Regions:
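Small-residue-rich segments of transmembrane alpha-helices in multi-pass membrane proteins
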Residues: 3-8, 51-67, 116-117, 177-178
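Solvent-exposed interhelical
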Residues: 1-10, 86-135, 140
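Transmembrane helix-loop-helix
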Residues: 2-45, 124-177
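Hydrophobic alpha-helical transmembrane segments in multi-pass integral membrane proteins
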Residues: 61-74, 129-137, 178
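Alpha-helical transmembrane segments
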Residues: 70-88
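Alpha-helical transmembrane segments and their lipid-water interface positions
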Residues: 37, 63, 92-93
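A cytosolic-side transmembrane-helix exit/cap motif
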Residues: 41-52, 69-75, 95-106, 165-174
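Internal alpha-helical transmembrane segments of multi-pass membrane proteins, especially GPCRs
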Residues: 28, 51, 76, 80, ...
């Protein structure tokens, strides 16, 4: 009831002092995470992290809506960036904590499909993530500094994902997670 009360208060504060779109998105994000992801998905499917990634991708949209009052293409690209980042990030953690997830009955990818398949998926999603980060400059929604930063940081991330894929093990997966 405490969480529900805070959620409702945050909605009314956001609606009253910011704008209705940001408030509704915030409420949708809370519902998505608490009900859809935590209660319904987390222990129901190996795709929990992929589908649940939407919950973590909503806050940038809330911020965008709060600042602009609408959702433009850039907001949706930010959503896509966080959405695509979530699986490789948490699958790397799931490799390291595989026994804990198995004991808790959470069907994370390494528990259900093994480390090798998970490592392959980490690499695939990381390639897709780096591609999505380039959409902002492609659509002239970000400048040269962002483009160069995305390429350099994306290169580091791809290297980390490649090492997870080729080398494997907890130490390499932990580096990818961090």
């Amino acid at each position: 009831s405490y969480g529900l009360a805070l959620s409702l208060i945050s909605y009314y504060v956001m609606a009253g002092y910011v704008n209705l779109l940001a408030a509704l998105l915030s409420l949708a994000g809370i519902f998505y995470y608490v009900i859809f992801y935590s209660v319904l998905l987390k222990k129901a499917t190996v795709q929990n992290i992929v589908i649940g990634g939407g919950a973590g991708a909503i806050p940038p949209m809330v911020g965008w809506a709060a600042a602009t009052g609408h959702l433009g293409l850039a907001a949706w690209i930010l959503f896509a960036i966080v959405f695509m980042w979530t699986p490789p990030h948490f699958w790397a953690l799931a490799i390291v904590r595989m026994k804990d997830y198995e004991k808790a009955g959470v069907p994370m990818m390494p528990v259900v499909h093994g480390e090798v398949k998970t490592r392959r998926h980490i690499l695939i999603y990381t390639i897709e993530l780096v591609a999505v980060t380039l959409l902002l400059p492609i659509f002239n929604l970000a400048g040269t500094v962002y483009l160069v930063s995305s390429l350099v940081l994306g290169g580091f991330l791809l290297y980390a994902a490649w090492r997870v894929f080729k080398v494997g093990g907890n130490k390499v997966a932990w580096t990818m997670y961090r």
